[in-house]
Amino acid sequence: MIKLIVGLGNPGAEYTATRHNAGFWLVDQLAREAGATLRDERRFHGFYAKARLHGEEVHLLEPQTYMNRSGQSVVALASFFKILPDQILVAHDELDLPPGTVKLKLGGGSGGHNGLKDISAHLSSQQYWRLRIGIGHPRDLIPEGARAGAKPDVANFVLKPPRREEQDVIDASIERALAVMPMVVKGELDRATMQLHRN
């Protein structure tokens, strides 16, 4: 059963619309659906709400520590409420999936994502669930003939807003993720994964 849903992103209005904040977009939607208000909670270093989602009580968290220190926020809340790693779902932007794709996964490496890296270090575990929201990779924007030897600027890419057509399909993928949340919060993660990956 998932007891904590974390959205990853960077704090501040200048980052709100950037690709790196896709995790925040999902948690914002969940809070809206539940009629919950995310409030600044200093002891958890983030915006926090306790919400009732599909009949289950769930903690929602958006760390306000900047991406590479997200673990500080997650471990503060998880320790306080005695939540185990496999009861945590972290929603984050995923470079290795094209825009419009969303996947659920338990455990694994960070794939170069600094937020995941820090969470794994603070939890001393990689065995938490991830909701991977595809944003594409900057190499995909380089014409095929010019890709050899090209060094895509990943840092710049994730800190820019998606193009209009990308935003539309990312929004649609978040809607698909929201549709499986009743299963997620009840602990039916395998069923949720199958449904999500079928689309």
UniProtKB/Swiss-Prot annotation:
Catalytic residues in the record: H20
Function text: Hydrolyzes ribosome-free peptidyl-tRNAs (with 1 or more amino acids incorporated), which drop off the ribosome during protein synthesis, or as a result of ribosome stalling. Catalyzes the release of premature peptidyl moieties from peptidyl-tRNA molecules trapped in stalled 50S ribosomal subunits, and thus maintains levels of free tRNAs and 50S ribosomes.
One GO MF term: peptidyl-tRNA hydrolase activity
Catalytically driven reaction(s): an N-acyl-L-alpha-aminoacyl-tRNA + H2O = an N-acyl-L-amino acid + a tRNA + H(+)
Subunit structure and binding partners: Monomer.
Primary localisation category: cytoplasm
PROSITE patterns xrefs: PEPT_TRNA_HYDROL_1 (PS01195), PEPT_TRNA_HYDROL_2 (PS01196)
Enzyme class label: hydrolase
Pfam families given in the database record: Pept_tRNA_hydro
GO biological process, one term: protein quality control for misfolded or incompletely synthesized proteins
Family statement: Belongs to the PTH family.
Gene Ontology CC annotations of this record: cytoplasm
Location in the cell: Cytoplasm
Native species: Burkholderia ambifaria (strain MC40-6)
Keywords: Cytoplasm, Hydrolase, RNA-binding, tRNA-binding
Sites annotated Discriminates between blocked and unblocked aminoacyl-tRNA: N10
Binding residue positions for tRNA: Y15, Y66, N68, N114
Annotated protein name in UniProt: Peptidyl-tRNA hydrolase
Site, as annotated: Stabilizes the basic form of H active site to accept a proton: D93
UniProt EC number: 3.1.1.29
Database matches in Gene3D superfamilies: Peptidyl-tRNA hydrolase
